[in-house]
């Protein structure tokens, strides 16, 4: 299994899980179909679906474009209802296992400022993947994890420092805190979950102004003793159940 990152920021989020067979599951619809085609050598024949967490543009802007190109888009009904185009749509219900090609996907509801899912994704090659973004916190323990794609949007210390220095305002600070996961919260989530079987942790959706990629990577590595990556456009990561 390979994880290919096409975008991981407020400019657009999109990730490809590519199995050894070539079968591809898209996560998030925040990148244009043109870029999807370029990433897959203009061959969409093995794309089985796109799963999307919520309706905000950096995650869902191009959903209709995907559908128009024959890609089924799967999400919660609240998210799918936000666009007019209804062809190639599939409603995902929370805490129900959905088989999508070689993948099995289960959604869990998380805390954001609109209806939002995180996903548990199972595949024989990758094992159990957690994909979690745009959530204030994760009030769950997930047994049997093998790989994590986890939001680490901001540092509380950096955010508070910028507020003190007049670089941001209370309204923005409060919106960030109420809708995104901090480094401190991500660390708390990792502490209470069993990471014995985890190979890789990919930190996603880092804020341009309120994060520090090198610091975040070091802190999570020191906490977990796992391979930690900071998501960047164009990055390819081996995403297997076994480390080698």
Residue ranges and their predicted role:
Residues 27-28, 50-52, 70-77, 89-92, ...:
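Short, hydrophobic beta-strand segments that form beta-sheet elements in well-ordered domains
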Residues 74-126:
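Metallo-beta-lactamase
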